[in-house]
Amino acid sequence: MDHLIQFWPILKRLIIYAIPWKKKIILAFFLLLSGATSEVLGPILISYFINNILSQHQLNFQLILIIIVIFIMLQILAVFFNYFQSILFNKIAVGIVNKLRNDVMKAALNQPISEFDSQPIGQMISKVTNDTEVIKELYDTVGPTFFRSITLIIIILFAMFTLEWHMAIITIFIIPLVIIVMSIYQYYSTPLLRNVRYYVANINNKFNETINGMNVIQQFRQQTRFENNIKESSELHYLARMKILKLDGFLLRPLLSLLSALVLCSFMFLFSYFSIGVYEVGVLYAFITYLGRLNEPLISITIQQSILQQAIVAGERIFSLIDSPKQKYGNNEEEIKSGKINIKNLSFKYKESGENILNNINIYIPSKSFVAFVGQTGSGKSTLANLLMGYYPIKHGKIYLDDKSINCISHDVLRKNILMVQQDPIVLADTFSSNITLGKKISEEKIWNVLKTVHLSSLVQSMPKGIYSILGEEGNNLSLGQKQLLAIARILVRNPKILILDEATANIDSGTEKLIQTTLSSIRAKTTLVVIAHRLSTVIEADMIVVLKKGKIVELGTHKQLLEKKGFYWKMYNFQLFNC
């Protein structure tokens, strides 16, 4: 019964998003009411014509002309009002969904990094795009259709009771039956629609995985396997949709049509008990017409029930993201001035049930020193770098920056003073300038100075538009080494107090590595430099080298001191030296 409990809270939250548009919504409902009233008045005119003109065999052409003109005017007004209310509701829907999509994106941007470790990217993309588009139909289709249908039902029933209350009472019995049908539909459709939304997100995730890994897929001839995976996901989505369609086909239009037919038979049965006069023929015509008109909004409401359920399920997925815990930071706005780091009794694991990645790490890094962390894959080097960046909450032990606990420092101060260059740099499909500034106001002179520092100025000068030259998707017109240098330029223009390089030279050629080493040498006097290194040749000049093994510090010292010990570092260095 959980899906029934969640229906109203989610619908209420979705309705709250419409409050800023209340003036336009009121105007749209006025147009909707006017259009519905214009539609309903038509059969009353025809009934009047049959009962008062046709039955009397006295053709008053002037009155007939007036009735015809009024009837045509009512139809024109109905079209006019319905057109403009449709345009207005669509405009409102787009505005609401734009706000909702912005909120979803804001929530995604403030998710803890740990969420991206466990959540497939396709699921996140589906929430931002597909689910918000489904919710759009709630505002531009379900809402207007529902209120238009309710308005029509009320006006039609009022007209029916005005004409003949016996027959109107029979008609009203169809409404509780419709409510029962809608309740049954909601009960059975919600879990099916959840499956549909899940399979859509799963297909998006597999497409994302396939496109991003296309080089590897083609290299290892895995096209057939990935094609079959996507086919399997599509088949599951198809089967889930078919279950919904079968439910729609049974509970929606066909069942309501049957109910309407039963009501019509009741009309005929009741009509047979009265003397058959022309007046009764006019009434019967009006009731048959109204029954057809009544059938349309009832069917519309039940059909919209399917779209409403899809919107509720999509809303459930979206609000689960919006309501999820955000990355927590401290409130201390005091700037980091020296850049010294003190790590005390630090232990860390990604999952509560998992094993420790880091175990009782203790180290002091002086201001403006060059410290390297080395070790085999899985030793905890990158985890330590992520903790220094404040990406994960620290529960066991402490990291102090300028004698302040990292858990107490504000997000703005952390991001301003501690920056990282990663192994796989992110390059935007934008200009050199935009990739360096990232929206921050920085002078052209400063951009050119930092490009000279990272030895990219000659490359940029050779391009037609210089720093305003557009880079390709993910910077595909740059080499990996050039991307890495650009990433370093992006960091240097901000003058961080602490600079972390996480395997920044692991995948580049020796020439680019030398350029990076030269760049780092030029900034050593300005910042605390923390290097996570795979190639030991890149950290020979470090003031201190920390050797990690299975999350523990096993050795500590300068390059010369560690070689003299002939321990774990000595073995690693000689292995790389003689196997290069």
From Swiss-Prot:
NCBIfam families tied to this protein: PRK10790.1 (NF008056)
Keywords associated with the record: ATP-binding, Cell membrane, Membrane, Nucleotide-binding, Translocase, Transmembrane, Transmembrane helix, Transport
Boundaries of every ABC transmembrane type-1 domain copy: 25-310
Positions annotated to bind ATP: G375, Q376, T377, G378, S379, G380, K381, S382
Residue stretches making up the ABC transporter domain: 341-575
Record CDD domains: ABC_6TM_TmrA_like (cd18544)
Enzyme class: translocase
Catalytic activity: ATP + H2O + xenobioticSide 1 = ADP + phosphate + xenobioticSide 2
Native organism: Buchnera aphidicola subsp. Schizaphis graminum (strain Sg)
Stated name of the protein: Multidrug resistance-like ATP-binding protein MdlB
